[in-house]
């Protein structure tokens, strides 16, 4: 082999080595780029997961709030229906109370004629039926004579001194009071003792 051929072979060897080195460097650089790209992809994936978790938490919170709101609406509706059942007759009962008062006033009068006695018994029976119907529907009578005065249940119409009774004791009842399922329909009008 001539010198020139030898030189060409050496140049080709060098070119092959250089090409191999360049290729190895490119592969290393490409691998580094791929590694960097994988790390970036991992960071992006972590960021996406975090965003999705935050969205999921927000949706869970909104769902819990909606569930709580629906539960509150259901309870409010049940309470409204219950109150409508309990107090639906309140206006009607209030309008009947003067009728009961009138009947009771009429029954206080003493009668002597036999026909009037029979009529009074019929009125007493009618009054009893009316009061029983009201009781059956949750209306209770308040006849607080002798009890302690309670401004939530009683309306003081007058005060009288009486050493036989303690202060704020109900001495007399002008007009009975009525409650409907624990709610005052009409306060009892009373006379209380004030010494």
Swiss-Prot record:
Cytoplasm as UniProt keyword: yes
UniProt cross-references to Gene3D superfamilies, sorted A to Z: 3.90.20.20, Head domain of nucleotide exchange factor GrpE (2.30.22.10)
PROSITE patterns the UniProt entry points to: GRPE
Any Pfam family matching the protein: GrpE
InterPro entries tied to this protein: GrpE (IPR000740), GrpE_coiled_coil (IPR013805), GrpE_head (IPR009012)
Reported function: Participates actively in the response to hyperosmotic and heat shock by preventing the aggregation of stress-denatured proteins, in association with DnaK and GrpE. It is the nucleotide exchange factor for DnaK and may function as a thermosensor. Unfolded proteins bind initially to DnaJ; upon interaction with the DnaJ-bound protein, DnaK hydrolyzes its bound ATP, resulting in the formation of a stable complex. GrpE releases ADP from DnaK; ATP binding to DnaK triggers the release of the substrate protein, thus completing the reaction cycle.
Family: Belongs to the GrpE family.
Complexes and interactors: Homodimer.
Protein name: Protein GrpE
Organism, scientific name: Francisella tularensis subsp. holarctica (strain OSU18)
């Amino acid at each position: 082999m001539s010198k020139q051929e030898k030189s060409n072979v050496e140049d080709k060897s060098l070119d092959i080595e250089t090409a191999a080195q360049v290729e190895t460097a490119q592969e290393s650089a490409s691998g580094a780029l791929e590694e960097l790209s994988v790390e970036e992809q991992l960071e992006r994936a972590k960021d996406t997961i975090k965003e999705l978790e935050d969205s999921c938490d927000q949706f869970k919170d909104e769902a819990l709030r909606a569930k709580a709101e629906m539960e509150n609406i259901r309870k409010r509706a049940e309470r409204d229906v219950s109150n409508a059942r309990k107090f639906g007759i309140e206006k009607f009962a209030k309008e009947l109370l003067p009728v009961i008062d009138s009947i009771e006033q009429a029954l206080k009068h003493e009668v002597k004629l036999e026909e009037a006695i029979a009529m009074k018994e019929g009125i007493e029976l009618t009054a009893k039926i009316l009061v029983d119907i009201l009781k059956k529907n949750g209306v209770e009578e308040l006849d607080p004579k002798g009890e302690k005065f309670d401004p939530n249940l009683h309306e003081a119409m007058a005060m009288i001194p009486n050493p036989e009774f303690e202060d704020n004791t109900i001495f007399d009842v002008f007009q009975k009071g009525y409650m409907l399922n624990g709610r005052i329909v009409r306060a009892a009008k009373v006379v209380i003792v004030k010494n």
